[in-house]
């Protein structure tokens, strides 16, 4: 187990990628504190993992929720080694022209208070504990932190902001605390919800046929599941393997950034080459 006796805090840990991270970290020997708004989801975590999990109901938009979670984490487990900012919402690729003028302020504030301020507040609350443990921070970014069309103007702008935060916080907090990010693409099993301000709060990404949409776009030829993406988080959370690693964002998106203009990949060339028996 690669995270034996490590203590981790995950925001948005009750569903989708967040739940997959919690499950994987517990399996790797970690003890995990979770901050989430879902009472039912928190109860499911307690039932699944027992004393390995501390579950706190709260809202990432408020510093007090983060402070309460950090305090309960340290009180229960004695320390905090890694903070994972993961809670977020999506705009379902709503273009600026599609956002009504009378909803733009509300939609902007909702997006940035959750997807940007929520991360910053979490780190602020965890600073003392992470300094004491010489710990680390991991942010869930997105392919939208690097490229257009992974969301609309609100989501893409927010994720670009997180890339900047990774770099700035790595500078400000080093050498005591490492700060890195992981930028997944679309994930199977994701429960990412939309903006309430755009009437998308009850829409779940799990209902969108992303797999069919992405299979011909990604160089890998398939969309990753949430569970398949957790290995990157384990890697960044380990101490022995990542001593010099800070200020980095790992593209974990199926190769979106290397697809060609007209084809997602040219693996057909290998198929043709080997089918002719050129190499065995």
UniProtKB/Swiss-Prot annotation:
InterPro entries hit by this protein: BphB-like_SDR, BphB_TodD, NAD(P)-bd_dom_sf, Sc_DH/Rdtase_CS, SDR_fam
Enzyme class, broadest EC rank: oxidoreductase
GO BP annotations, alphabetical order: catabolic process
Domain of life from the UniProt record: Bacteria
UniProtKB keywords: Aromatic hydrocarbons catabolism, NAD, Oxidoreductase
Catalysed reaction equations from the record: (2R,3S)-3-phenylcyclohexa-3,5-diene-1,2-diol + NAD(+) = biphenyl-2,3-diol + NADH + H(+)
Binding locations of NAD(+): 9-33
Gene Ontology molecular-function annotations: cis-2,3-dihydrobiphenyl-2,3-diol dehydrogenase activity; oxidoreductase activity, acting on the CH-OH group of donors, NAD or NADP as acceptor
Known EC number: 1.3.1.56
Pathway this chain belongs to: Xenobiotic degradation; biphenyl degradation; 2-hydroxy-2,4-pentadienoate and benzoate from biphenyl: step 2/4
Record: active site: 155 (proton acceptor)
Name used for this protein in its record: Cis-2,3-dihydrobiphenyl-2,3-diol dehydrogenase
Gene coding for it: bphB
């Amino acid at each position: 187990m690669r995270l034996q006796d490590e203590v981790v805090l995950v925001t948005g840990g009750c569903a989708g990628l967040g739940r997959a991270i919690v499950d994987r970290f517990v399996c790797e020997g970690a003890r995990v504190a979770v901050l989430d708004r879902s009472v039912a989801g928190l109860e499911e975590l307690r039932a699944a993992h027992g004393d390995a999990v501390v579950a706190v109901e709260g809202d990432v938009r408020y510093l007090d929720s983060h402070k309460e979670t950090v305090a309960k984490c340290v009180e229960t487990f004695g320390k905090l080694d890694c903070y994972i900012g993961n809670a977020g919402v999506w705009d379902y690729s709503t273009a600026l022209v599609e956002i009504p003028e009378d909803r733009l302020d509300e939609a902007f504030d909702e997006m940035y208070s959750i997807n940007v301020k929520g991360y910053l507040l979490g780190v602020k609350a965890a600073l003392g504990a992470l300094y004491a443990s010489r710990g680390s921070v991991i942010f869930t970014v997105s392919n939208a932190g690097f490229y257009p069309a992974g969301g609309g103007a609100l989501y893409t702008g927010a994720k670009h902001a997180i890339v900047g935060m990774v770099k700035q916080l790595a500078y400000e907090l080093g050498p005591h605390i490492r700060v890195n990010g992981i930028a997944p693409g679309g994930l199977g099993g994701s429960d990412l919800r939309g903006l309430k301000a755009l009437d998308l709060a009850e829409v779940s990404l799990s209902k969108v046929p992303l797999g069919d949409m992405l299979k011909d776009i990604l160089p890998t030829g398939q969309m990753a599941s949430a569970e398949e993406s957790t290995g990157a988080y384990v890697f960044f959370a380990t101490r022995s393997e990542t001593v010099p690693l800070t200020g980095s964002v790992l593209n974990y998106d199926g190769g979106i950034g290397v697809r060609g203009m007209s084809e997602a990949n040219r693996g057909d060339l290998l198929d043709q080459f080997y089918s002719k028996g050129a190499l065995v």
